[in-house]
């Protein structure tokens, strides 16, 4: 899995050199931000269920047809609602993985690579998940550097869906 740290090490190793001062400063900066990232990951994990439930409700309010139309991709049945919550949870989990890893590697490898194919195969609208992620971003309760770190990965997911 790629992270800024592993990429810097791989580049230096490929070139048979030590890390440059610039690369070392970047790694040092990452370690300083790691405390805030871990705080954010813990908070998102501890509040995951309420964030997921709230995000699902935000989707249903913005796109009310999702709760009335029939089909496995809609939330008109308890099973459909459970699938919606599961999918929102997957996006939130990816954000926490990125926070722990310190880069977008987990999202790039486990989510974005097949995102458009999954959405088209199952007739899922990216706008549903964008709305869910916007809700999570607006309601996660994080402040300071922890919010900055979490919001960066939430925005990354939103941009990937756009």
Swiss-Prot record:
Q: Which residues bind (2R,3E)-phycocyanobilin?
A: 84
Q: Which Gene3D superfamilies match?
A: Phycocyanins
Kindly state a single biological-process term from the GO annotations of this entry. Answer: photosynthesis
| Localization of this protein | Cellular thylakoid membrane
Give the way it sits in the membrane.
Peripheral membrane protein
Q: How is it modified after translation?
A: Contains one covalently linked phycocyanobilin chromophore.
Q: Which Pfam families match?
A: Phycobilisome
Which PANTHER family does its entry note? Answer: C-PHYCOCYANIN ALPHA SUBUNIT, PHYCOBILISOME 32.1 KDA LINKER POLYPEPTIDE, PHYCOCYANIN-ASSOCIATED, ROD 2-RELATED
Quaternary structure, per UniProt, is:
Heterodimer of an alpha and a beta subunit, which further assembles into trimers. The trimers assemble into hexamers.
Annotated family: Belongs to the phycobiliprotein family.
Q: What does this protein do?
A: Light-harvesting photosynthetic bile pigment-protein from the phycobiliprotein complex (phycobilisome, PBS). Phycocyanin is the major phycobiliprotein in the PBS rod.
NCBIfam families attached to this UniProt entry: phycocy_alpha (TIGR01338)
Q: What is this protein called?
A: C-phycocyanin alpha subunit
Q: Which gene encodes it?
A: cpcA
